[in-house]
Amino acid sequence: MATFKDACYHYKRINKLNNNSLKLGVNDTWRPSPPTKYKGWCLDCCQHTDLTYCSGCTMYHVCQWCSQYGRCFLDNEPHLLRMRTFKNEVTKDDLKNLIDMYETLFPMNHKIVCRFINTARQHKCRNECMTQWYNHLLMPITLQSLSIELDGDVYYVFGYYDNMNNINQTPFSFINLVDIYDKLLLDDVNFTRMSFLPASLQQEYALRYFSKSRFINEQRKCVNDSHFSINVLENLHNPSFKIQITRNCSELSFDWNEACKLVKNVSAYFDMLKTSHIEFYSVSTRCRIFTQCKLKMASKLIKPNYITSNHKTLATEVHNCKWCSVNNSYTVWNDFRIKKIYDNIFNFLRALVKSNVNIGHCSSQEKIYEYVKDVLNVCDDERWKTSIMEIFNCLEPVELDDVKYVLFNHEINWDVINVLVHSIGKVPQILTLENVITIMQSIIYEWFDIRYMRNTPMVTFTIDKLRRLYTGLKTVEYDSGISDIE
């Protein structure tokens, strides 16, 4: 049973304010929706179910019923989900405003309780106070939230989430903010509400309250590519692909954490709802998460034997070689930038190997191959540098004055020559480990400069940020022939 969903359904009928603010897609007529993929809690109705992706941020956080309203916790329209969403530093006053909003939308008094009990008893065999008939009265006010960090901004989506031990495949984690407020004050609020309930329901209310107000915070999760719509992931190989998102907007002039105060002034709240509209944005996929996804896909297709081969062609253009031919049927190769990086990295590595080690054919089995598997995964800095260090050590470097050197006197292509000139100022004949790391980073950074990339895509930006970028024409950062550096 989804307690929050039931509470919205029943309390929606008590006045005009609630009829507008407590409207949920899950309580309305179902409409066709995108297929579900992950298990977790819908941020809109707070029930644990199968989730589909949100049209506002492309992350999986909405159920197939609520998706029809297209609400996102990053919206600018003061719908219930947005008013329950807080950002970054949350103060005691902010939490007091949230509790006041709950008290306004979900009041508990003798009149309300009698009204709901009388409504339930109109049905046959409902003279007893059983929890399934009064689930909407058993929603305590808690400071339980699902939290996520997006590029330095931390969001808290408050609500009443049942069954906290259920499987959670979303990037949101449970955070309890009761210590910022005051446990005793929150206890007093709930004990007062509980006093209006029949004795047979009070125990269930108390159990729910304490279980949701005394839990230990979960460890914050890291957002990764699997948390975004499969439609986006399937098109990452296209350099000019743009993500289409929609956001619900209004003339919301409050600070982010003060949206919940709107329900105190009903006329002003309805005036603001009149300004509600939908804004459409086309944004770039450029970010560390998606870049790492593409580089990992290419890493799985690496043929390390090429670095000991004598092929005259580029690494991705070798055909009819059992050890070096790359399977070009994978969509990751449709991105010419990935091909360029792969070709130049392996052209440079082959020159290093041929300059220092006497290996004559690509069919030979060498220890160096096992370290080549990670040369593209530059986003995992520690693992990547360890891989380069092991490759360097396999080249039998010569040590002089505590510095190790390797030779570099084999032919390379013009692209690699240009990288050498730009990164270290010349085409050298000896290289240190630091030189090798710098050169290989430069080959990748020419197309994917992760040093200046945000971690998550622009779909996780707030409306204010999107509007500023849209004004500067920066929401679509793509061009089929221009690199990051250019």
From Swiss-Prot:
Tell me which domain of life the UniProt entry assigns to the organism this sequence originates from: Viruses
| Record flagged with keyword Cell inner membrane | no
Has the keyword Transmembrane helix been applied to this entry? no
Question: Where is the segment annotated Interaction with host IRF3?
Answer: 317-486
Region (Zinc-binding domain) residue spans: 42-79
Which molecular function GO terms apply here?
metal ion binding; RNA binding
Where, by residue number, is the motif IKBKB-like degron (ILD) motif? 479-483
Chain positions covered by the region annotation RNA-binding: 1-81
Write out the ranges of the annotated region (Important for cytoskeleton localization).
82-176
**Disulfides per UniProt:** none
Protein keywords: Host cytoplasm, Host cytoskeleton, Host-virus interaction, Inhibition of host innate immune response by virus, Inhibition of host IRF3 by virus, Inhibition of host IRF7 by virus, Inhibition of host NF-kappa-B by virus, Inhibition of host RLR pathway by virus, Interferon antiviral system evasion, Metal-binding, Phosphoprotein, RNA-binding, Viral immunoevasion
Where along the sequence does the record place the motif called pLxIS motif? 480-483
Q: Which InterPro entries match?
A: Rotavirus_NSP1 (IPR002148)
| Post-translational events | The C-terminal region is phosphorylated by host CKII/CSNK2A1. Phosphorylation of the DSGXS motif is essential for host NF-kappa-B inhibition.
Report the locations given in the UniProt record: Host cytoplasm, Host cytoskeleton
Q: Which GO terms describe its cellular component?
A: host cell cytoplasm; host cytoskeleton
Output one GO BP term: symbiont-mediated suppression of host cytoplasmic pattern recognition receptor signaling pathway via inhibition of IRF7 activity
Main role? Plays a role in the inhibition of host innate immunity by inducing the degradation of key host factors required to activate interferon production such as IRF3, IRF5 or IRF7. Associates with components of cullin RING ligases (CRLs) including CUL1 or CUL3, which are essential multisubunit ubiquitination complexes, to modulate their activities. Recognizes the host NF-kappa-B regulator BTRC through the presence of a DSGXS motif in the C-terminal substrate recognition domain.
Quaternary structure, per UniProt, is:
Interacts (via C-terminus) with host IRF3; this interaction leads to IRF3 degradation. Interacts with host IRF7; this interaction leads to IRF7 degradation. Interacts with host CUL1 and CUL3. Interacts with host BTRC.
- Entry domain remark: The integrity of the zinc-binding domain in NSP1 is important for degradation of host IRF3.
Q: Please give the family membership noted in the entry.
A: Belongs to the rotavirus NSP1 family.
- Name assigned to this protein: Non-structural protein 1
Organism whose genome encodes this protein? Rotavirus A (strain RVA/Human/Japan/K8/1977/G1P3A[9]) (RV-A)
